[in-house]
Amino acid sequence: MKLLSKIMIIALATSMLQACNGPGGMNKQGTGTLLGGAGGALLGSQFGKGTGQLVGVGVGALLGAVLGGQIGAGMDEQDRRLAELTSQRALETAPSGSNVEWRNPDNGNYGYVTPNKTYRNSTGQYCREYTQTVVIGGKQQKAYGNACRQPDGQWQVVN
């Protein structure tokens, strides 16, 4: 199953957990911790075999939960929407090495996506390496990844 599909399942499961939490749902930090932990476990499972893979899952879940909680504590839904739209635009149109910025005027949070190397994967899809930087409450955090262009024109994170 592709990584983005797994992420969508995790997001759906998190939404369901929030619904079970009663009126108001879970706070942003709780959501970030859940998503970060699940995403970290998913990423950690991509490395090693046997016991090494289990260690990767555990370490990934722990680091993802910590980072996700920190980011989620400050990012709201508008921040996430702006970051996603900017990511799609940057990966599709921006030259390698250029920053494409988003900014939430309501809370001052901002970030940028820097697309880097463009390449074709084994199935012929165009893919790009990228760096995503977010500044939440004055604290900067970076993430690195790869995304591939889907037939519908959307970019899908692959790791």
UniProtKB/Swiss-Prot annotation:
A lipid is attached at C20 (N-palmitoyl cysteine). It is a lipid-anchor. A lipid is attached at C20 (S-diacylglycerol cysteine). Residues 1-19 form the signal peptide. It holds the Pfam family 17kDa_Anti_2. It is found in: Cell outer membrane. The keyword tRNA processing does not apply. GO terms for cellular component: cell outer membrane. It comes from the Bacteria. Keywords: Cell outer membrane, Lipoprotein, Membrane, Palmitate, Signal. Belongs to the rickettsiale 17 kDa surface antigen family. This is 17 kDa surface antigen. The gene is omp.
